[in-house]
Amino acid sequence: MAVQRTFSIIKPDAVAKNVIGKITTRFEEAGLKIVASKIKQLSKAEAEGFYAEHSARGFFGDLVAFMTSGPVVVQVLEGENAIALNRELMGATNPKEAAAGTIRADFAESIDANAVHGSDSEAAAAREIAYFFAATEVTTR
């Protein structure tokens, strides 16, 4: 099993609920290390650029509006099979379908306000990390 890096966003709904620490604890207790982190308010341009692959889909405008509705926490997580592990911790995109004990089952409201985002592949992780972090901002622990 390889050590990987993955990208995570704690979305505005979870930040507003003040559960950043609870979510971060889940990452760490599962063996993931946080090697970069920032709290930021996304601009419309940043959100549109990050989610550009969805620009032709009907939900794009609502997604951008939601992601700019409040601050987010962007993070780089590192660990054995970090991408798959993070996706397992998050649970299904729709919190109603998420397994009990997953982040989305415990903290998300809806398929739109679903608490967290995580990279779905190594290519996506590399792109998403580079979108928010310079190489000098990502450490090794």
UniProtKB/Swiss-Prot annotation:
Presence of the UniProt keyword Iron-sulfur in the record: no
Cofactor(s) required for function per UniProt: Mg(2+)
A Pfam match: NDK
Stretch forming the signal peptide: none
UniProt catalytic activity: a 2'-deoxyribonucleoside 5'-diphosphate + ATP = a 2'-deoxyribonucleoside 5'-triphosphate + ADP; a ribonucleoside 5'-diphosphate + ATP = a ribonucleoside 5'-triphosphate + ADP
Example GO molecular function: ATP binding
Classification via Gene3D superfamilies: Nucleoside diphosphate kinase-like domain (3.30.70.141)
Places the protein is found: Cytoplasm
Active site, renumbered: H117 (pros-phosphohistidine intermediate)
PROSITE patterns: NDPK, NDPK_LIKE
GO cellular component, one term: cytoplasm
EC numbers, comma separated: 2.7.4.6
GO annotation terms (biological process): CTP biosynthetic process; GTP biosynthetic process; UTP biosynthetic process
Keyword Kinase: yes
Keyword line: ATP-binding, Cytoplasm, Kinase, Magnesium, Metal-binding, Nucleotide metabolism, Nucleotide-binding, Phosphoprotein, Transferase
Residues engaged in binding ATP: K11, F59, R87, T93, R104, N114
Main function: Major role in the synthesis of nucleoside triphosphates other than ATP. The ATP gamma phosphate is transferred to the NDP beta phosphate via a ping-pong mechanism, using a phosphorylated active-site intermediate.
Recorded family membership: Belongs to the NDK family.
Subunit record text: Homotetramer.
PANTHER family hit by this protein: NUCLEOSIDE DIPHOSPHATE KINASE, NUCLEOSIDE DIPHOSPHATE KINASE DDB_G0292928-RELATED
Protein known as: Nucleoside diphosphate kinase
Species classification: Bacteria, Pseudomonadati, Pseudomonadota, Gammaproteobacteria, Pseudomonadales
